[in-house]
Amino acid sequence: MQKSGIFILNKPKNISTYQLINQVKKKLNIKKVGHCGTLDLLATGVVICLVNNATKISDYLLNANKAYQVKIKLFTLTDSYDGEGNIIQTQIPFDISLDQINKVISKYNNYSYEQYPPIYSSIKVNGKKLYQYALANQDVEIKSRKVTIFKTKLLNYDQKNYEIFLDVKCSKGTYIRSLAIDICKDLNTIGYVVELNRTLSGNFDINSAIDIKDLSWKHLTSIYDAVKINDFKVVKYHNILDVKQGKKIVLNNIKDQLVFISDEQNNILAVYQKYENNIFKVKRGGLNNDIY
């Protein structure tokens, strides 16, 4: 019988998230493997790998906020907004002061706005990914999405090499490549992402992430610990049979709209949602089914 849980992986550069997940599957001979959000090919950092029954809670972990460190090269623009693309525009460098940069950066603190994703992205329009339109040189309407930038901090400004190094905390769905373009526009210039490292996904930190070459079953985080780490409400329920059968249950003095139900051994059994008053109904069950 195989265990269920998550691995906190540190994705290296130049492999896709899909390739990384496949490596996990083959290395540990796991039947069901998923993830909580892709990273660009050139990006590095935290990827949450879901194993077996943990794949059933992907939506809850996927909605988590993220944090990144990003290096932006000024005065050059690529079609993909990163180093993987082709250069489509250059600009004669001009002086941008540290004060100017700090003034622009300060705008992106607790800032919500309509962001346009890059054409080279996996967002689907009419059943087709945006990058497929780009590769086929086809026109497509790109719709904006509301995102929130909670905090942006300037880590370094390399004036000699025209590079800005930032720390960004943002909501799910934020494209850092698009954010880089927007920051450059505010500086009256162009730019692209040369380095991108995801340092946080929910409460999973880069310092806890494992390189694929070092990965083993000992690095598995249980579903129980994963949901606790991310501040979800966990309730131990006395009648396990009712939960396994997907029946409505009564939970008193619970303010949360969503709760994870566990047994006395800290096995997460199901996700329940508030139905009315103190009655909860099952939203996702079968989280403790055996995988062979």
From Swiss-Prot:
GO terms for molecular function: RNA binding; tRNA pseudouridine(55) synthase activity. Keywords: Isomerase, tRNA processing. The keyword tRNA processing applies. Gene3D superfamilies: Pseudouridine synthase. It catalyses: uridine(55) in tRNA = pseudouridine(55) in tRNA. The active site is at residue 40. InterPro entries: PsdUridine_synth_cat_dom_sf, PsdUridine_synth_N, tRNA_psdUridine_synth_TruB. It is an enzyme of class 5 (isomerase). SUPFAM superfamilies: Pseudouridine synthase (SSF55120). PANTHER family: PSEUDOURIDYLATE SYNTHASE TRUB1 (PTHR13767:SF2), TRNA-PSEUDOURIDINE SYNTHASE (PTHR13767). This is tRNA pseudouridine synthase B.
